[in-house]
Amino acid sequence: MTDSENESTETDSLMTFDDYISKELPEHLQRLIMENLKGSTTNDLKQTSNNSEFNVSKNGSFKGLDDAIQALQMQSVLHPSSLGSLATSSKFSGWSFAQGFFVGQLSIVLLFIFFLKFFIFSDEPSKSKNPKPAASRHRSKFKEYPFISREFLTSLVRKGAKQHYELNEEAENEHLQELALILEKTYYNVDVHPAESLDWFNVLVAQIIQQFRSEAWHRDNILHSLNDFIGRKSPDLPEYLDTIKITELDTGDDFPIFSNCRIQYSPNSGNKKLEAKIDIDLNDHLTLGVETKLLLNYPKPGIAALPINLVVSIVRFQACLTVSLTNAEEFASTSNGSSSENGMEGNSGYFLMFSFSPEYRMEFEIKSLIGSRSKLENIPKIGSVIEYQIKKWFVERCVEPRFQFVRLPSMWPRSKNTREEKPTEL
């Protein structure tokens, strides 16, 4: 066979696109339809083949694409049960999918609207009263100190009531005489003595605070210390919270002002205990800024994260500070490994107890920024939640009837504490 004959044969085997549309495609459609109907309804197709009214040409093929479409219409009329079930199931499945999709989207939109309305864009609540400490089951002899902070008194417990707690009448009278003698020799009458300004005390406190600020900011010591502390506490954080990092820290540049100091008997103590009432006022800008991320751990850990930046500032603090002295006779050490010397020092030491009145005033300035691209700024609800938690932490530790105490160092002169001034270089 020559090359010209091969080329003519290949040319005859090719088909134009118009011929495929008018001849080959209808035949393919016919075969597909017939195979589908034969597989589903064999008996009906046998009866249909005898009574068929299709207009088929002598060579068994449809005349064009119009004949194929006409055949589909006729088949749907003659056999509605075979095609109707398929159409009904498709319609039902399509409607079920659309219905579920619509309900799912609607629920997400409603949940998002509820979150925005009641959590993010809700109005900031009016200034409510300060949180109150929870009731405690341990009450002391004096009603002004019925609570003891467990976090600061972990190494101390009350002694046995029968052996050490109750003072006999002779010891009580001796204590009353000591208080009266102190007031007499210091020319102080708790009933008529005017309040003092404490200007000299403010100067001393200001020097101490200034020294603390200088040491804190030397080579960013306080910033590194806080970040290290938070890093050690990271395993205790909840799973939905990422590592917390301090981004801003300001220790302020002002000093607290103490004033209106007066000495009085502790309420409900039967004139057996003295305490000092001091008004304190701080108008400064103490700031702490942190950043973290809220993690979404479903369906797999860390699938999404929401950046959060918070800056909390205390701009005003006013309160009445109560200060009193007490010895260690009401407490006993629970440390088993302490030496006898330490035990003697614990029993003979004195403690400075302090607390704040419930009528304190603490004002905050809270800034928040949530999101990475589309950011929500200064959400009132977040500010109110943070403010409430800070006040709650403060009330549960330092607000009456709870108190804190600091052990006073021994005032007895010791050689290891002796110092002398360095000679001035000329």
From Swiss-Prot:
The chain crosses the membrane at residues 101-121. Residues 194-409 form the SMP-LTD domain. GO terms for molecular function: lipid binding. It is found in: Endoplasmic reticulum membrane. The keyword RNA-binding does not apply. Residues 1-100 are lumenal. One of its GO terms (biological process) is phospholipid transport. Disruption phenotype: Loss of mitochondrial integrity. Abolishes growth on non-fermentable carbon source (glycerol with ethanol). Slow growth on fermentable carbon source (glucose). Synthetic lethal with VPS13. Keywords: Endoplasmic reticulum, Glycoprotein, Lipid transport, Lipid-binding, Membrane, Transmembrane, Transmembrane helix, Transport. Glycosylated. Residues 122-426 are cytoplasmic. InterPro entries: Mmm1 (IPR027537), MMM1_dom (IPR019411), SMP_LBD (IPR031468). Glycans are attached at N6, N50, N55, N59. Homodimer. Component of the ER-mitochondria encounter structure (ERMES) or MDM complex, composed of MMM1, MDM10, MDM12 and MDM34. A MMM1 homodimer associates with one molecule of MDM12 on each side in a pairwise head-to-tail manner, and the SMP-LTD domains of MMM1 and MDM12 generate a continuous hydrophobic tunnel for phospholipid trafficking. The SMP-LTD domain is a barrel-like domain that can bind various types of glycerophospholipids in its interior and mediate their transfer between two adjacent bilayers. Component of the ERMES/MDM complex, which serves as a molecular tether to connect the endoplasmic reticulum and mitochondria. Components of this complex are involved in the control of mitochondrial shape and protein biogenesis, and function in nonvesicular lipid trafficking between the ER and mitochondria. The MDM12-MMM1 subcomplex functions in the major beta-barrel assembly pathway that is responsible for biogenesis of all outer membrane beta-barrel proteins, and acts in a late step after the SAM complex. HAMAP family: Mmm1. Normal levels of MMM1 require MDM34. Belongs to the MMM1 family. This is Maintenance of mitochondrial morphology protein 1. It comes from Saccharomyces cerevisiae (strain ATCC 204508 / S288c) (Baker's yeast).
